[in-house]
């Protein structure tokens, strides 16, 4: 079944995702930054050789985009990440264009987004969070759920949605 395959390829035995107690999804989760800092500094969290925690604090929000070649809109997940997100999820790799710049209103689009939504091609602009965001790259994640997301700088996305809190810690 396609849904089971997607869920299996999105997760990993090598990391865990922390959400708020009773949150049924990343979107419903709210973690304050202080709690996230406590989590990433726990001794169970793997570390880079320089001692930094191997973790990614993330904001996950839903936006609406116009469908490509059809009428109507549909929900798309936007994920604000830290640099470690790419080491924690090695299946996510840029296949076209380039990585977004940290501190910029730029995003990379999952391969599944580019064929289904308007404005999701390299060089195009997507409006969300009260601003225009430039799509600078396309990524593939081996058919995982991430292929249906837009990714950008955690701080830029949190700022655009006026989010002082986080959604998850991976």
Residue ranges and their predicted role:
Residues 1-77, 96-98, 103:
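Hydrophobic, regular-secondary-structure patches
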Residues 10, 46-49, 55, 66-73, ...:
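Mechanotransmission and gating elements of multispan inner-membrane complexes involved in transport
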Residues 17, 106, 168-170:
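Short aromatic/hydrophobic contact patches that present stacked aromatics
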Residues 19-20, 31, 80-81, 108-109, ...:
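A conserved hydrophobic position in a structured secondary element of the catalytic/binding core
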Residues 24, 61-63, 83-86, 141:
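Active-site/binding-pocket entry motifs
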Residues 74-116:
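Short beta-strand boundary microenvironments
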């Amino acid at each position: 079944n396609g849904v089971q395959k997607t869920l299996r390829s999105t997760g990993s035995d090598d990391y865990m995702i922390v959400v708020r107690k009773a949150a049924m999804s990343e979107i419903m989760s709210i973690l304050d930054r202080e709690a996230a800092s406590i989590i990433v500094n726990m001794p169970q969290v793997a570390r880079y050789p320089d001692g930094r925690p191997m973790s990614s604090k993330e904001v996950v929000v839903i936006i609406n985009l116009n469908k490509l070649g059809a009428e109507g809109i549909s929900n798309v997940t936007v994920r604000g990440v830290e640099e470690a997100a790419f080491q924690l999820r090695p299946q996510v790799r840029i296949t076209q264009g380039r990585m977004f710049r940290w501190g910029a209103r730029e995003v990379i689009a999952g391969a599944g987004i580019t064929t289904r939504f308007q404005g999701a091609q390299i060089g195009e602009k997507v409006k969300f969070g009260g601003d225009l965001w430039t799509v600078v790259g396309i990524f593939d994640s081996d058919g995982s759920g991430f292929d249906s997301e837009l990714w950008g700088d955690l701080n830029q996305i949190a700022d655009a949605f006026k989010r002082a809190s986080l959604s998850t810690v991976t």
